[in-house]
Protein backbone atom coordinates (compact mmCIF):
# COMPACT_ATOMS: atom_id res chain seq x y z
CA UNK A 1 0.00 0.00 0.00
CA UNK A 2 1.45 3.35 -1.01
CA UNK A 3 1.01 6.75 0.57
CA UNK A 4 -1.16 9.14 -1.42
CA UNK A 5 0.42 12.57 -1.78
CA UNK A 6 -1.44 15.69 -2.78
CA UNK A 7 -0.48 17.32 -6.07
CA UNK A 8 -0.57 21.07 -6.48
CA UNK A 9 -2.73 20.72 -9.61
CA UNK A 10 -5.45 18.75 -7.79
CA UNK A 11 -5.81 21.43 -5.15
CA UNK A 12 -8.95 23.44 -4.54
CA UNK A 13 -8.87 26.32 -2.09
CA UNK A 14 -11.84 27.34 0.04
CA UNK A 15 -12.47 30.68 1.72
CA UNK A 16 -13.13 30.91 5.46
CA UNK A 17 -14.10 33.92 7.57
CA UNK A 18 -13.21 34.15 11.26
CA UNK A 19 -14.81 36.71 13.56
CA UNK A 20 -12.24 37.83 16.15
CA UNK A 21 -14.65 39.94 18.23
CA UNK A 22 -14.19 39.09 21.91
CA UNK A 23 -11.86 36.17 21.13
CA UNK A 24 -8.23 35.95 22.33
CA UNK A 25 -5.80 37.15 19.68
CA UNK A 26 -3.53 34.13 20.04
CA UNK A 27 -6.30 31.58 19.74
CA UNK A 28 -7.62 33.29 16.63
CA UNK A 29 -4.10 33.32 15.17
CA UNK A 30 -3.62 29.59 15.82
CA UNK A 31 -6.85 28.76 14.02
CA UNK A 32 -5.94 31.01 11.09
CA UNK A 33 -2.44 29.53 10.83
CA UNK A 34 -3.81 25.98 10.74
CA UNK A 35 -6.31 26.90 8.02
CA UNK A 36 -3.60 28.67 6.01
CA UNK A 37 -1.35 25.60 6.20
CA UNK A 38 -4.19 23.20 5.37
CA UNK A 39 -3.76 21.09 8.50
CA UNK A 40 -7.53 20.67 8.81
CA UNK A 41 -7.66 18.70 5.55
CA UNK A 42 -7.53 14.94 5.33
CA UNK A 43 -4.99 15.02 2.50
CA UNK A 44 -2.57 17.45 4.21
CA UNK A 45 0.93 17.19 2.78
CA UNK A 46 3.68 19.09 4.63
CA UNK A 47 5.73 19.95 1.52
CA UNK A 48 2.80 21.20 -0.59
CA UNK A 49 1.08 24.55 -0.12
CA UNK A 50 -2.42 23.12 0.34
CA UNK A 51 -3.98 25.72 2.65
CA UNK A 52 -7.10 27.80 2.21
CA UNK A 53 -7.83 31.53 2.15
CA UNK A 54 -8.68 33.09 5.52
CA UNK A 55 -10.49 36.36 6.22
CA UNK A 56 -10.33 37.69 9.79
CA UNK A 57 -12.83 40.42 10.61
CA UNK A 58 -13.15 42.62 13.72
CA UNK A 59 -9.43 42.52 14.51
CA UNK A 60 -9.87 45.69 16.55
CA UNK A 61 -12.20 43.80 18.92
CA UNK A 62 -9.78 40.92 19.61
CA UNK A 63 -8.66 40.69 23.24
CA UNK A 64 -5.46 39.84 25.08
CA UNK A 65 -5.68 37.59 28.13
CA UNK A 66 -3.93 38.37 31.39
CA UNK A 67 -1.77 41.48 31.61
CA UNK A 68 -0.46 41.21 28.05
CA UNK A 69 -2.19 44.41 26.98
CA UNK A 70 0.10 46.39 29.32
CA UNK A 71 3.15 44.08 29.42
CA UNK A 72 3.60 42.88 25.83
CA UNK A 73 5.94 44.95 23.68
CA UNK A 74 6.39 44.82 19.90
CA UNK A 75 9.90 45.64 18.66
CA UNK A 76 11.17 46.76 15.27
CA UNK A 77 14.61 47.93 14.16
CA UNK A 78 15.30 50.55 11.50
CA UNK A 79 18.86 49.36 10.90
CA UNK A 80 20.43 52.59 12.09
CA UNK A 81 22.36 52.95 15.34
CA UNK A 82 19.86 53.44 18.14
CA UNK A 83 17.03 52.59 15.76
CA UNK A 84 15.23 50.17 18.06
CA UNK A 85 11.57 51.14 18.29
CA UNK A 86 9.11 49.59 20.70
CA UNK A 87 5.33 49.73 20.86
CA UNK A 88 3.12 48.48 23.67
CA UNK A 89 0.28 46.11 22.82
CA UNK A 90 -2.38 48.62 23.91
CA UNK A 91 -1.09 51.24 21.45
CA UNK A 92 -0.72 48.62 18.70
CA UNK A 93 -4.32 47.46 19.14
CA UNK A 94 -5.62 51.03 19.04
CA UNK A 95 -3.67 52.05 15.94
CA UNK A 96 -2.94 48.90 13.93
CA UNK A 97 -4.87 45.93 15.27
CA UNK A 98 -4.71 44.21 11.89
CA UNK A 99 -0.90 44.34 11.97
CA UNK A 100 -0.82 42.85 15.50
CA UNK A 101 -2.94 39.95 14.24
CA UNK A 102 -0.71 39.57 11.18
CA UNK A 103 2.41 39.36 13.36
CA UNK A 104 0.76 36.71 15.55
CA UNK A 105 -0.21 34.56 12.55
CA UNK A 106 3.16 35.10 10.86
CA UNK A 107 4.97 33.80 13.94
CA UNK A 108 2.95 30.58 13.79
CA UNK A 109 3.70 29.82 10.13
CA UNK A 110 6.87 28.12 8.88
CA UNK A 111 9.80 30.41 8.14
CA UNK A 112 10.24 29.39 4.49
CA UNK A 113 8.54 29.84 1.12
CA UNK A 114 5.50 27.83 2.24
CA UNK A 115 4.94 30.29 5.08
CA UNK A 116 5.34 33.30 2.79
CA UNK A 117 2.82 31.98 0.28
CA UNK A 118 0.41 31.09 3.09
CA UNK A 119 0.63 34.63 4.47
CA UNK A 120 -0.46 36.06 1.11
CA UNK A 121 -3.80 34.27 1.55
CA UNK A 122 -4.51 36.00 4.88
CA UNK A 123 -6.92 38.95 4.67
CA UNK A 124 -7.40 41.14 7.77
CA UNK A 125 -10.07 43.80 8.38
CA UNK A 126 -10.72 46.00 11.40
CA UNK A 127 -14.47 46.19 10.93
CA UNK A 128 -17.16 43.61 10.25
CA UNK A 129 -17.27 44.30 6.49
CA UNK A 130 -14.97 42.69 3.92
CA UNK A 131 -14.89 42.87 0.10
CA UNK A 132 -14.69 39.09 -0.45
CA UNK A 133 -18.40 38.25 -0.51
CA UNK A 134 -18.13 37.04 -4.12
CA UNK A 135 -15.92 34.14 -2.97
CA UNK A 136 -18.73 32.92 -0.67
CA UNK A 137 -16.59 32.37 2.46
CA UNK A 138 -17.75 29.87 5.06
CA UNK A 139 -17.86 30.96 8.71
CA UNK A 140 -15.30 29.17 10.89
CA UNK A 141 -16.04 29.19 14.61
CA UNK A 142 -13.33 28.94 17.24
CA UNK A 143 -13.53 26.02 19.66
Residue ranges of each PLM-predicted region?
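Ribosome large-subunit tunnel/peptidyl-transferase-proximal elements
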Residues: 1-103, 113, 131-143
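C-terminal structural segments of small proteins and small subunits
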Residues: 102, 109-131
Amino acid sequence: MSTTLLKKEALERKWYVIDAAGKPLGRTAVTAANLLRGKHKVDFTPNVDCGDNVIIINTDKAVFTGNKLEDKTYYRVSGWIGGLKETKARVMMEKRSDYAMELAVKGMLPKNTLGKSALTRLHLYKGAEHPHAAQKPEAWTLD
